[in-house]
Design a protein with these regions (language model features):
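Short, recurring structural edge motifs at helix starts
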Residues: 20-23, 113-116, 126-131
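A short beta-sheet element
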Residues: 37-42, 46-103, 115, 120
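Short, structured segments at the rim of ligand-binding sites
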Residues: 25-28, 51-53
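Amphipathic alpha-helical segments
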Residues: 3-4, 125-166
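Non-catalytic DNA-recognition/assembly elements of restriction-modification systems
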Residues: 1-18, 28-38
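A short beta-turn/loop motif at secondary-structure boundaries
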Residues: 25-27, 118-121
Length: 166
């Protein structure tokens, strides 16, 4: 099995969202999620009438204590300026696999020496990731999805049991 190593800049287009504040969210309420640098609610800060992105993307939080948090997005959405966005351009790369691989690597590249932790685009695009063949990436992503779902269910059940005991 051949493993290929790519830097993000060699397989993705990197960008950021736009300036979206709470006033804009209030005045433009709709059905499309807006993602920010927050991590609660999967990074969703609200919903608006329009969208800027449509398809499979990987996003990351660029600032604050959760800088480097990685998310897989699939569908129509917008993003705030504190949300980095990767669009996979290489057909040999599964976006969901990329998201899982980046979750493992991104935190290593966060600048924690500044007053506000930050993960700049210039750092993200230099991150090297090892990729097995596409079929293997898809299998790994499916396995990790299943594990993530089971883990969330188990956590919810344990929380419910602990709450019931108290």
């Amino acid at each position: 099995m051949e493993i290929k190593t790519y830097k993000i800049k060699d397989i993705c287009e990197a960008s950021h969202g736009r300036e979206i504040n709470t006033k804009y969210l209030r005045e433009n309420q709709g059905i499309y999620p807006v993602y920010s640098s927050a991590t609660s609610n999967e990074g969703e800060m609200g919903r608006i009438k329009t969208y800027d992105f449509d398809g499979e993307y990987v996003t990351w939080t660029t600032r604050w204590s959760y800088a480097g948090s990685i998310y897989y997005r699939n569908g129509k959405f917008s993003a705030s300026s504190n949300c980095g966005i990767l669009k996979v351009l290489n057909k040999e790369i599964n976006p969901k696999f990329l998201a899982y691989a980046l979750k493992k690597e991104a935190k290593k590249f966060v600048n924690t020496t500044s007053a506000i932790p930050i993960l700049r685009t210039q750092k993200v695009v230099e991150i090297p990731i090892d990729f097995p063949p596409l079929q293997i990436q898809e299998k790994i992503a499916t396995i990790l999805d299943t594990f993530t779902e089971l883990s969330a269910e188990l956590s919810a059940e344990l929380s419910a049991e602990l709450s019931a005991e108290l």
